[in-house]
Amino acid sequence: MIGGLFLNTLSFVIVSNHVVNNTANVHHIQQEHVIVQQTQIVSARTQNYYPEFSIAVLFVSFLALYRSTNFKTCVGILMFKIVSMTLIGPMLTAYGYYIDGIVTTTVLALRFIYLSYFWYVNNRFEFVLYNTTTLMFVHGRAAPFMRSSHSSIYVTLYGGINYMFVNDLTLHFVDPMLVSIAIRGLAHADLTVVRAVELLNGDFIYVFSQEPVVGVYNAAFSQAVLNEIDLKEEVEDHVYDVPSGINCHR
């Protein structure tokens, strides 16, 4: 794929040299005619050179920066990057496409070295695997951390009464208050559960933050849904009456 994008970047130079070599043994009038044609060919090829080279650089940059939250996809992309950096890049250079091979190898290698720094500091290979500089760790399980608006650090995880989903993994627990999240990389923070929001379908949204949650408000619901929520809360409220025959002061 990379070779297909790069194969035409220097081909106009080969065409130019071929035309120049063939015009040496041609009559003066024919030579002028061939030179005019050569100039038109080289000019047309030169106009196409910059868009092709720009697309090639953008593609390699996209490949170096692309990230996914799916574990299997990340493994496949990482293997393709390693093959491109160690095999395709040198192969392009060996076949004479020096710019193509150098750009491919250099961009991917610089990105790998940059991520390897976070791998070395935090001793976790997931920085290279997920192609990101910030990860969140939930009881040893790593997942990409998506920075929220205004650079505030908080995490919301979806789950149930005794489990929550961490990326494509399921974390089971006894008490949600015992679950903590460690943010490592460009950001450094330790988060705990500050609120467990119960949804109408019985699922939960767990909010992790450094600041306590004061309250959660219902909004954007129809009156019928609000009435159903109030009815559910009334059913769950239990009032225990003390029998008159029991002496509470004893």
From Swiss-Prot:
Subcellular location: Host membrane
Limits of the CoV 3a-like viroporin TM domain: 40-130
Residue ranges crossing the lipid bilayer per the database entry: 46-66, 75-95, 101-121
Membrane topology: Multi-pass membrane protein
Domain CoV 3a-like viroporin CD: 134-213
GO cellular component, one term: host cell membrane
The organism's place on the tree of life at top rank: Viruses
Entry keyword set: Host membrane, Membrane, Transmembrane, Transmembrane helix
Entry-linked InterPro entries: a/bCoV_VIROPORIN_3A-like_CD, a/bCoV_VIROPORIN_3A-like_TM, Coronavirus_Orf3a/b
Main location class: host cell
Signal peptide extent: none
Physiological role: May be a virulence factor.
Family, similarity comment: Belongs to the coronaviruses NS3b protein family.
Name of the protein this chain belongs to: Non-structural protein 3b
Taxonomic placement: Viruses, Riboviria, Orthornavirae, Pisuviricota, Pisoniviricetes
